Amino acid sequence: MFEYDPKKSICTCARVTYGDMAEAVEKGARTVADIREKTRATAFCGSCTERVEKFLTALQTGEAKAVVQAEEPVSESEIVAPGFRQVCEDIYYVGASDRAADRFEKQYPVPRGMSFNSYLLLDRQTVLFDTVDQSVREVFLRNLETLLGERRLDFLVIHHMEPDHAATIAEVLRRWPKCQAICTPGAKKMLGQFFGPQLAKRAQEIRDGVSMLTGKHVLSFHNAPMVHWPEVMVTYDRTSETLFSADAFGTFGALDGNLFADQVNLSDWMDEDRRYYTNIVGKYGGPVQQLLQKASQMSIRRICPLHGPIWRQDLGVILDKYRKWSTYTPEEKSVVIAYASIYGNTELACQALAGILSDKGVRDVKLMDLSREHPSYVIAEAFRRSHLVLASVTYNGGLFPDMEHFIHQMKHHGLKNRTVALMENGSWAPVAARKMDELLTGTENHVLGKKITLLSTLKRSQLQELEELADAILSSMK
């Protein structure tokens, strides 16, 4: 006999329980394909396929028996208080932070975790702006249910379909069956791709610039394609002068109680703002410029992004950064020296160059070891500064892999308008400078003609060459 708990998950990806599957069989499902169509079980990673097959056989042969585990009643006084926060009149934060996260998008280190923001408007009609990542699903749903109470959820505005914001859409629409989703045509197509055609039917496509009255509040919807996916839009609440900005103006890091940007050490957060922008959105400067142009026509008192703190003061600070970043304009005239060194000889030459640059008046020179630093940090520093020195050993007749990877990252994230100097090392047949120059072709960066070639180590006789390279860098800063 196959004993099962109807409330237990059989497919965690699609959040399908044994009870859901048993119900699907009662309604005529006969094959695994039928189960997939009706419940989405097995449609994602496939690890549940064997369980589904065994349970399906047990149901069809009459050998399945439901065994409901008794649950102790929990009084409301024992339930942990939700983490919703008021943003302004009628608008609440209902998101949450995942402090256990160590990588964002499986690649970017987030040592301080990650926040996944969602907002609820309580007007005559209720509006939820985006959902959250699966990692914070339970806290988000508690926040939402507590704030709504007996009220229904009327609308779900979907700004962006990336799963860190869209993973719980199906759950929200299941819990509030009369809720209507609002999104761009591109987002509706993705709804069908992620969750199936039936759920996509719950979405109303919205045109660019269309407005909606929810009671006191007037919402207008504005397309923001490629910031940083094609289906993205933002929402402007004319009544509270709030911009719900999707991924724009977001950052890495969990929220540690301080919900607003004016409550945190901004210099600490700005480094992560920059790293977030340059690595997530950096390639799409043109689309960001278009969004900034739209935003300039709005009277904005606060910006509510999908990651990081809410901006309600000094909005000019982050807007100015976005203008620079999206036009690939350096924030400061300075130098980052990114090097790939195996035994330390190339690193020593870079340290010597850094000292010479400092003596000549260049402030805040940054040395970064590509074998130790994650590329996202180096990309952020390269966006920040006007000049970049790339120094690499020759390896297997080409570039050291970490340097090659970094230059590909530069190209991938669209870094341009920088002045680049090259240094190479090789005990025989050094070719690293030529390989770097070839990779940089077409990147809209200016490569200085002066290059340094080391033969195993930096010689005293080459210090003059470093002086000349430093002078060339200084001259190009004017």
Where are these regions (language model features)?
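Conserved beta-strand hairpin/beta-sheet module of binuclear metal-dependent hydrolase folds
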Residues: 84-145, 234-237, 242-245, 346
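Divalent metal-coordination and catalytic microenvironments
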Residues: 90, 121, 160-162, 235, ...
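Active-site-proximal loop/helix segment associated with metal-binding centers of metalloenzymes
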Residues: 228-232, 248-282, 326-331
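Local cysteine-cluster metal-coordination motifs and their immediate loop/turn environment
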Residues: 6-21, 37-57
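Metallo-beta-lactamase
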Residues: 75, 79, 85-89, 183-232, ...
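Active-site neighborhood of phospho(di)ester-bond hydrolases with catalytic His/Asp-centered motifs
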Residues: 129-131, 153-161, 181-184, 243-247, ...
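Active-site metal-binding motif and surrounding structural segment of the metallo-beta-lactamase
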Residues: 124, 135-182
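FMN-binding flavodoxin-like domain, especially the glycine-rich phosphate-binding loop
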Residues: 83, 255, 265-303, 307-310, ...
